[in-house]
Amino acid sequence: YRECFQTLYNQIDQEDSTDSIILVAGDVLHAKTDMSPEMVMLATEFLINLADRAPTFIIAGNHDLNLSNMNRLDSLTPLVNSINHPNLHYLKHSGIYTVGDTDLAVYSILDSNESWPSYKDCESKNKVALYHGPVYGAQTDAKYTISNRHVEVSLFDGFDMVLIGDIHRYQVLQERSPGKPAVVYSSSLIQQNHGETIDNHGSCLWDMQTYSHVFKKLPNNYGYYTLEVKNGKVPVLTDVPKNVRMRIFTGTLDSTGVKKLISVLSSACKQACHGYE
């Protein structure tokens, strides 16, 4: 994580951060309210490094709290309060938050739909909606398409941009057009498991003059890789990270073939954790 985060910091440092802000669309954490000392330290370092570079705004994600018990405190509140950085802002609840010439409209998962804002509540030049959750038509890495119409793209009509977190796959749900905002999932920074692809992880750099963006892929020397052997033939390895956790589907290979395959892979990959079927 630290290696990837440092790469992110380097990417940010290469840009002109004058009059820029950083938006984190939820899921800073992973284990909801189960906070280990290592997690607290790493998350603290991460948020401080972002806030040192530009004003940083965070919204809550489903992994930052226990949605099944709303009486519990979310994990971001004590973390942000403890850091107490003047450039770090937690936009916990739904509402309009004005930053310079931009209104950030937060659709918080902690609040009911009735309390969600509208573009009509915005008074600034730029109108940006922030949401964490599934949106109808979005696709996961497992090729599952969100069919729940609880939140549709049309909900955000009237905004200039909609920045969404939750699904770990970069995707553009809608291009900007008159009355219709650009709606984008920025992806997660880091691949989390074998169910996600190695690529399409990173961040989006937005131009507030044109409401256009560039996806900035975040290189990672660590990752998960699935190798599938079909009819005894091993496919050519592509995009394998230097440090890999490899899952192997051996198909019809016998035990001798499996051992030989693992031996070859172990010498080819710096670090590997093999699990095969």
What residues fall within each predicted segment?
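Active-site glycine-centered loops adjacent to acidic/histidine catalytic or metal-binding residues
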Residues: 26-27, 61-62, 132, 165-166, ...
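Core catalytic region of metal-dependent phosphoesterases/phosphodiesterases
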Residues: 1-96, 155
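Conserved catalytic scaffold of divalent metal-dependent phosphoesterases
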Residues: 64-154, 182, 186-188
